[in-house]
C-alpha cells in the first residue's frame, strides 16, 4: 500500500511522517454549557475527512482520531481525571459499508475513555452536508437513546460546523438526565 499523501510505501493509508506533519490545533467551543473540543483545522484535513463517504475512510479517519485521542488522554491525566468516561458517537449507523462515526470513536477511545456503540441514533436521516442553518433548524435529528443512563458520557462527531447536531444531542441527553461531560469533534469548520 502507498501513503495517500506522499505515495511512499506504507502499511497504513497515511505514513507516520505524513500523520505527524498534520498539526493538532486544539480548539474549544461551548454549546449548551458543555465544552466541545476539536483537534484539527478543517482546511488541514479537508481531503482526508471527505474520505468518510468511501470505504477507505474506515482506515484513514481512525488514524487521525488516534493521534488526537492520545493527546486528549494526556490532558485528562494531567487534570487528574481518571474515572471511566463512555463515548457516544452521534448517529453511528452503517452507511457505505461502515459507520464513520463508530470508526472515529474506536480510534479516539484510549485509557479511561471507553467506546459505546449504537447508543444515540437519529430518527431523521436527512444529510446536513452543505445545507443552510435554516434547513438544519427545520429538520431536527430527533434522537433516541439506548443505554445506561447512569454512566458518565462524552459525545463524539466528525465535524462541528454550526453546532446544530451537537446542540440537539446535548439538549436531548439533558432531558433524560444523562450527563455528557464534554463533546469531541475531529475538526472545526469555523476557522
Roles of regions detected by a PLM:
Residues 86, 154, 181-184:
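A structural signal for isolated positions on well-ordered beta-strands in alpha/beta enzyme cores
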Residues 10-11, 23:
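Short functional micro-motifs and their immediate structural scaffolds
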Residues 167-191:
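PRPP-dependent phosphoribosyltransferase catalytic core
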Residues 155-169:
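A phosphate-binding catalytic loop at a beta-strand-loop-alpha-helix junction
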Residues 106-127:
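Histidine/lysine/aspartate-rich catalytic loop segments that bind and position anionic ligands
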Residues 16-86, 94, 120-150, 187-191:
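Active-site-facing substrate-recognition patch
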Residues 3-6, 15-18:
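Short cysteine-rich clusters marking metal-coordination/redox-active sites
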Residues 89-101:
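Glycine-rich phosphate-binding loops at beta-strand->alpha-helix junctions
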Amino acid at each position: 500500500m502507498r501513503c495517500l499523501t506522499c505515495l511512499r510505501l506504507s502499511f497504513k493509508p497515511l505514513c507516520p511522517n505524513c500523520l505527524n506533519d498534520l498539526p493538532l490545533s486544539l480548539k474549544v467551543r461551548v454549546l449548551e454549557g458543555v465544552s466541545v473540543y476539536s483537534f484539527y483545522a478543517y482546511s488541514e484535513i479537508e481531503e482526508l475527512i471527505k474520505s468518510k463517504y468511501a470505504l477507505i475512510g474506515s482506515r484513514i479517519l481512525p488514524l487521525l482520531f488516534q493521534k488526537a485521542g492520545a493527546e486528549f488522554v494526556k490532558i485528562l491525566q494531567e487534570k487528574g481525571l481518571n474515572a471511566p468516561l463512555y463515548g457516544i458517537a452521534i448517529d453511528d449507523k452503517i452507511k457505505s459499508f461502515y459507520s464513520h462515526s463508530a470508526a472515529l470513536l474506536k480510534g479516539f477511545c484510549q485509557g479511561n475513555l471507553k467506546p459505546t456503540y449504537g447508543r444515540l441514533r437519529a430518527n431523521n436521516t436527512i444529510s446536513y452536508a452543505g445545507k443552510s442553518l435554516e434547513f438544519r433548524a427545520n429538520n431536527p435529528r430527533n434522537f433516541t437513546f439506548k443505554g445506561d443512563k447512569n454512566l458518565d458520557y462524552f459525545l463524539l462527531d466528525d465535524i462541528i460546523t454550526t453546532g446544530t447536531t451537537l446542540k440537539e444531542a446535548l439538549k436531548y441527553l439533558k432531558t433524560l438526565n444523562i450527563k455528557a461531560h464534554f463533546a469531541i469533534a475531529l475538526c472545526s469548520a469555523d476557522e
